[in-house]
């Protein structure tokens, strides 16, 4: 399958959703020198497009990593794949559309270290975003993050939200979701210049 922008994806039958378009994430200001970290990469819709701009892209994916790697190769871009999930550092059972996997998890600071740094963070990790510690965002210039409310994940991390509010200029696009997924939003955040 070829998307409108020319990005190609393998189409195979899987028990989970394969995301090929991500218009909800704003990526127009990714810079060539940015170190981009895509947490929750699925099959590559964001990281493949980011890798057409920056040569320093890492993708974290716990469930769909095989198809992600195949799509990266199909598009002829370089993306480092980290087969893990954002979490507290303990192995965790991750579920995506009824596919369960026991995977290693890492705190954001450890994923950033493994990736060689992070200037632009995209995070779509089904509620695990609330495990991010505010200090782990140090030095990140841009954030694109899906925010979940229960029943996905846990209660919002007020300390994280307060820290983002103090350090970043931001907006949140609310996404109406009905049914068991609760309510979601997409955070778009830009690090403020020090005065």
Where are these regions (language model features)?
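Phosphate/nucleotide-binding beta-alpha loop and adjacent structural elements of enzyme active sites
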Residues: 1-195
């Amino acid at each position: 399958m070829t998307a409108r922008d020319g990005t190609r994806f393998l189409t195979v039958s899987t028990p989970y959703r394969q995301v090929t378009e991500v218009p909800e994430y704003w990526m127009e200001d990714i810079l060539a020198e940015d170190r981009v970290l895509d947490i929750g990469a699925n099959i590559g819709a964001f990281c493949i497009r980011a890798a057409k701009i920056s040569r320093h892209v890492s993708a974290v994916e716990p469930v769909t990593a095989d198809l992600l790697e195949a799509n990266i190769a199909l598009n002829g871009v370089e993306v480092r794949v980290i087969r893990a999930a954002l979490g507290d550092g303990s192995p965790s059972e991750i579920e995506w559309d009824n596919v369960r996997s026991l995977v290693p998890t890492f705190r954001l600071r450890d994923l950033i270290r493994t990736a060689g740094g992070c200037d632009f963070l995209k995070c779509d990790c089904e509620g695990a975003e609330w495990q991010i510690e505010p200090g782990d965002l140090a030095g990140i210039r841009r954030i694109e993050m899906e925010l979940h409310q229960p029943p996905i994940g846990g209660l919002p991390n007020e300390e994280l939200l307060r820290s983002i509010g103090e350090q970043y200029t931001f907006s949140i696009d609310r996404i109406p979701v009905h049914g068991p997924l609760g309510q979601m939003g997409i955070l778009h955040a830009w690090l403020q210049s020090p005065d």
